[in-house]
Amino acid sequence: DVFKGHTVEEAEDIFICGTHATTPSPQLVSKEWPRPWLYSRVFLMFTAAFALLWLCCNLFGNPNALPGMIVVGSFTVPLSTMIMFMEVNAWRNISLYKVIQTFLVGGCASLVATLMLFSIVGSHELNLIGAIVTGIVEEAGKAVIVFWFLSKMKRLSILGGLLIGASVGAGFAAFESAGYALQPVLAFFQNSGYYAAYGRQLDASMMMDAINQSIIIRGFLAPGGHVTWAAISGAALVIAGKALRRFDTSLLTDKRFLRLFIIPVILHAAWDSPMSNIGSSIYLVPIALTVIVWIVVMILINMGLAEVERVTKRQ
């Protein structure tokens, strides 16, 4: 439904879902394959804001707009993808407030959890072993936070697990991308003193080119990265929890969870490994991994809809 016309009221109906007054009863939950569209409007809105801030920085040379450009540009695709998962949640039982809370607090908490794990295992070069370690550590860091948020929910579902996982992953991706986009700025100021000592002037246009490239490339690849990897972990936790009929920390070592959790770990490791150098000029490996992860997500969405049908038949 992306290319169909939609009213403001339709968008508002999606954004107000999940409250005590707006959560539908199980009998009214749709069992049809979801047709999300609002995420595309969110994407266009953020893209327009980014374009305007880009003009301020690149056309008019106003540095005051640079922080906004970095933040808006880095958040555009992760947030839009998160909204898509919100639309896919047929239960309509998770509010926008909860989603934003999970995005902000969960995203930042997953960064802290990941850094804590790295402080234990140490950082590695991104060779094959280093990529595997990175995949395990970062996906485990996100999974722990996803588990915590899911443990606070009254009703667990596969589609809800996908949404909570995607929200944590989107926060992780957005803040990480903003950090990468900031690196050229830090390098610029670090080098400016060196250049000044030799009476030379540093060209700021190279810095801006590097920032723009980082934002655009990471945004382009974001749908196949942290958002969907964490979404799979969220669904895996719910599937394992329903099989065990409990939701506690034992899930994190349960074979049902680990069988699915290994998928984002492998995809993440492959993404960071030297294998990514194959066809790097056209981002062949990341694009191929994106296709694979979305096939897995589609399978999980189908499982979630089958769960909806089972539950509604019992009502």
Label for each model-derived stretch:
Residues 1-315:
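Hydrophobic alpha-helical segments at protein termini of multi-pass membrane proteins
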